[in-house]
Each structure stands twice: as structure tokens, then as C-alpha cells.
């Protein structure tokens, strides 16, 4: 009997070994500053079926995340966050398994799409529970702004909170925090008096028709244009976390302004990636074809009386104070710092500030461009409280963005 058991286990060993693959990843910080929560992304295309993963550093388990970017039930990328000292090099061991489920870790990001629950009248404004993760409206829909409870998909890290309006503006509206924590699941952008008394944040920016924080739009030769007309407009959540959330805004059949006569309609996907521990948000702009003959725009709202900063190389920011609502009796004035960082190769011109916006006119060579947005609220106990502090932070932030860690894979 014992001999048979031994032979059975021996026969199973090759299968067990085959079921997992190990990768060694070295991460080097070339900068003379300590860096926290640095995203490390591993493309899984070459590793066959991956159902679960384990990341360790010196034998200690590190939280990781598997993402199915195209929603075909296959994981495309693995993500983990590295804390690395100045000039330090660390090695991480990744074990990939072709069975099981992704390991659970505490959530450090959150994303939500929700419709109002009109049946249960007892629910408060911040207790709505008709959760969805994909919504499409026809281009001739009369009024999509109020279709979702908080007007569009929202997402957050411990440091920030953003919602994207589900209409032709597609503006990023901002939630300011006092404490470094996740809040949107509880407040849904509608913080009640009890939550405010406990130190929860709230909406801190009135955006109107402006860019808000880095909305991506067209350019008609004289001014920014909203994303219309379109055949359909969609929002969806690709990933809920726990280390990064990914949401997409998809415009199909957009008749965008172009530099040629009779341009054809284009499809555009705006992918927003929010990493834990980050106040900045990555924006990927993806098209279904080359858009060399089109012009686009982005920028930030000119907050009333704001002070401007520009390094004339793609980093543009402001610091200002205004009411976050037209109801000036209910709301107090809020001070915010905003910024957008655009690659120089995509900039056609940096336009002078007007009463609404600090604007960049953009071009896209090929089918994709990427940029970043970031902000702070002066309410933060962990943030920045003057224009000088904010602008100094942004200069250091840009250096980190342009000096990535060095990642090497060893199979």
C-alpha cells in the first residue's frame, strides 16, 4: 500500500511543477530619493494560462493583482507595488499558477458605478446600491448626466477621489480628503453631516464646461470642443483593485474636428489608471486608427483667482480658491492645486490662460498618447497648503515620472 502511494505521488510531481512558473524580477531605483508604491507591471502574454500569483521579496509576501484588460476571461497583466530606497536594488520572486484564484489582499483603491435605487425609498443619498460596471448610451440620448447616481464612474486611492461625468464633457470632478483613507464607498460623493463630523471629505471643485482636471477633448481651431456627436458613449470598470483600479470611457463614432476636409468618425477609449498610494492618475488615450490629421486639447480649469505655474515643457498647474457649487450658502470655498503633465511631442501649443482654462492644443502621432493628471486639496492633513509647496512638489514629481525604476526579468 505504501509503495503504491509513493508511486502515485511521484507521478504527480511533474504535473505540480508544470503548474507553476517562477520569475525573478530585479527593480533598481536610479534616483537619490526613496520611492514608495512604485507600480511594477508584468505582461503575462508569454506565460500561458495564469489563474493565481504569488509575489515575495526576501521570503515575505507582497500584495499583487491580476488584471484582465480586454475582459476575455484571461489575465493580461500582473501588478505589484515596490517600496525602494535611494539607489537601491531589490529582487522579487513571482510564482504564477495555472489553477486557483487571485489571492485576496486589503483594498487600497476603489471604483464604483451605481444607479439610484428608486424602489427602496429608505436609502439615503449615499447608500445607493444598484451597482453596475458597464453602461452605454446612444449618441442621441436626451440627457445622460443623471443616469448614474453620482453622474458617472468614480474611483479613488487613499489620497484622492475622482468622478467622470457621463456626458459630452467627460470632465474629471474632484473629491477632497482630510485623512488618507478610502471614502467613496461610504459617501458616494454625497457626504452627509455625520460623515463630515467624522472627518470625511467632499466635492471640492466646480467644473462647469471647463476641463476640470485634464479632460480630453477636441479642438476646432479656436477653442476646445466637447466629445460630440458620437454614435455611442460608454463607461466601464475594468479592474476594482486592490492595488490599482482601471476605468474606461469609450466614445464610438466621434465626429471630431480635424485639419482635413470631410474627416471620418473615430473611436476613442480613455483609460484611467489609479494606483494605490498615488495622488496622480495615468490617462491612456487610445484610437481605432491613426489620428495624425486631428487636433485635440486638454488642460485644467482656471480656478477663480488662481496662480499659474508652467515649466513650458508640458507641466502646467494652478493653485486657487472657489466655491465647489453654485450654492454658495451651503458650500464653503475650497482651495485646490491642479496639474496636468503632457509629453512634449504631443503639444502643438500652450495657449494663454482665459477665464475658463489653462489649455494645451494636442496632436497624436499614430493611435495613442498618454498623459498624467494630479491634484491636492488644502483640506488634506497629509498634503500641500500653499502654491509654493504645490509647485515645488510638482517639479519633484516630474523628475520621478521621467526617471522610472529599472525593471529586469529573469526566467
Outline where the language-model segments fall:
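Extended, loop-rich substrate-binding clefts of extracytoplasmic carbohydrate-active enzymes
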Residues: 195-275
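Alpha-mannosidase-like glycoside hydrolase catalytic domains involved in N-glycan trimming
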Residues: 20-127, 134, 138-143, 150
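Primarily extracytoplasmic ectodomains and periplasmic/lumenal surface modules that are beta-strand-rich
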Residues: 31-35, 46-51, 101, 155-156, ...
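Polysaccharide-binding surfaces and accessory modules of carbohydrate-active proteins
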Residues: 21-27, 295-347
Amino acid at each position: 500500500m505504501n509503495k503504491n502511494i509513493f508511486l502515485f505521488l511521484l507521478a504527480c510531481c511533474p504535473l505540480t511543477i508544470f503548474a507553476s512558473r517562477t520569475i525573478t524580477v530585479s527593480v533598481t531605483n536610479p534616483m537619490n530619493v526613496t520611492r514608495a508604491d512604485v507600480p511594477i507591471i508584468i505582461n503575462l502574454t508569454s506565460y500561458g494560462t495564469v489563474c493565481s500569483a504569488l509575489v515575495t521579496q526576501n521570503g515575505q509576501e507582497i500584495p499583487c493583482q491580476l488584471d484582465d484588460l480586454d475582459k476575455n476571461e484571461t489575465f493580461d497583466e500582473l501588478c505589484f507595488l515596490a517600496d525602494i530606497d535611494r539607489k537601491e536594488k531589490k529582487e522579487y520572486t513571482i510564482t504564477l499558477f495555472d489553477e486557483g484564484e487571485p489571492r485576496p489582499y486589503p483594498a487600497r483603491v476603489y471604483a464604483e458605478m451605481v444607479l439610484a435605487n428608486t424602489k427602496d425609498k429608505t436609502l439615503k443619498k449615499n447608500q445607493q446600491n444598484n451597482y453596475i460596471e458597464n453602461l452605454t448610451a446612444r449618441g442621441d440620448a436626451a440627457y445622460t448626466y443623471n443616469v448614474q447616481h453620482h453622474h458617472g464612474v468614480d474611483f479613488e486611492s487613499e489620497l484622492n477621489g475622482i468622478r467622470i461625468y457621463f456626458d459630452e464633457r467627460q470632465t474629471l470632478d474632484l473629491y477632497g480628503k482630510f485623512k488618507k483613507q478610502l471614502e467613496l464607498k461610504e459617501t458616494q460623493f454625497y457626504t452627509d453631516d455625520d460623515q463630515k463630523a467624522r472627518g470625511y471629505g467632499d466635492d471640492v471643485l466646480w467644473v462647469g464646461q471647463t476641463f476640470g482636471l485634464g479632460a480630453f477633448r477636441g479642438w476646432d481651431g479656436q477653442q476646445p470642443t466637447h466629445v460630440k456627436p458620437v454614435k455611442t458613449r460608454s463607461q466601464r470598470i475594468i479592474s476594482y483593485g486592490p492595488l490599482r483600479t482601471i476605468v474606461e470611457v469609450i466614445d464610438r463614432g466621434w465626429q471630431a474636428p480635424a485639419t482635413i476636409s470631410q474627416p471620418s468618425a473615430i473611436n476613442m477609449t480613455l483609460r484611467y489608471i489609479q494606483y494605490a498610494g498615488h495622488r496622480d492618475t495615468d490617462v491612456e488615450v487610445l484610437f481605432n486608427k491613426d489620428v495624425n490629421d486631428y487636433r485635440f486639447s486638454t488642460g485644467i480649469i482656471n480656478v477663480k483667482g488662481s496662480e499659474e505655474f508652467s515649466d513650458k515643457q508640458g507641466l502646467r498647474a494652478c493653485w486657487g480658491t472657489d466655491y465647489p457649487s453654485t450654492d454658495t450658502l451651503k458650500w464653503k470655498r475650497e482651495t485646490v492645486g491642479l496639474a496636468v503633465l503632457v509629453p512634449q511631442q504631443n503639444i502643438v501649443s500652450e495657449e494663454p490662460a482665459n477665464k475658463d482654462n489653462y489649455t494645451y492644443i494636442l496632436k497624436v502621432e499614430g493611435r495613442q498618447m498618454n498623459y498624467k493628471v494630479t491634484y491636492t486639496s488644502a483640506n488634506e492633513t497629509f498634503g500641500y497648503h500653499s502654491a509654493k509647496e504645490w509647485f515645488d512638489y510638482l517639479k519633484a514629481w516630474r523628475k520621478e515620472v521621467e526617471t522610472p525604476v529599472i525593471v529586469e526579468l529573469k526566467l
